[in-house]
Amino acid sequence: MASTLPLSGVVITRNEADRIGRCLASLAPVCTELRVLDSGSDDETVAIARAAGAVVEHQDWLGFAAQKTLATSRARQPWVLLLDADEWLDVQSQERIAGLFASGHIESRDVWCLPRRTWFLGKPLRFGGWAHEYVHRLSRPDLRYLPVLVHEGPDLTGKRVGHCEARIEHETARSLDEYRAKLAGYARLWAQQRREAGRRAGRMSAAVHAAAYWLKHYVIRGGFLDGRTGWQFHACHARYVYDKYDLLRRTPSA
């Protein structure tokens, strides 16, 4: 690639020493600036990021949405590509982003939605619930994330949104146990968020929603076609769906 673009590559981190290098290396060919907002890593994350040429700043954890909003706002280029540390771009995606800028079409939208392919335990998921996922990651620095505890998304009010086929690769789990623990944490945050909004769950809600998830994603959308990997992934998520509604039902209001 001849030159970098008017683009800041932005990542939020905490203890991502085994992944941040790959992420930043994939951003470097297209980004004029690399920025990392770290929330207190006690491994080699910060050192690796600085060695990769990133500007590293510290911010105590504010929550997913606020942390991403702050990290994005500190970018010094007119465009931002926000990745998680467990994500990266391949060469083809770098070229597609470069082409979007070279054509001038980048200016026709405020936010660009990119496809994301999830890898689970070393294998790509080609079927099921996450096989055709899109995420809003290429934007102006003024993009804000909605203030929710989990599964944060950008505020697209008044934004012109486009689609670019520069795919983000996403390695979602280091191990099965780690992934289960992460989903358990998400379930607690989801239940807290819904409870604070005045929502409740009935006695059968957990079982019904988990069964519906399994039927829709593992059966109808073909998650079973990914073999053992597909079974493990969708079993984790069916359990996650069960847990979040069960927590919502069992935990009393404050």
PLM features per residue range, with description:
Residues 32, 46-74:
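Conserved donor nucleotide-binding strand/loop of the catalytic core
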Residues 65-72, 78-79, 83, 90-254:
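Catalytic-site signature of metal-activated, phosphate-bearing donor transferases
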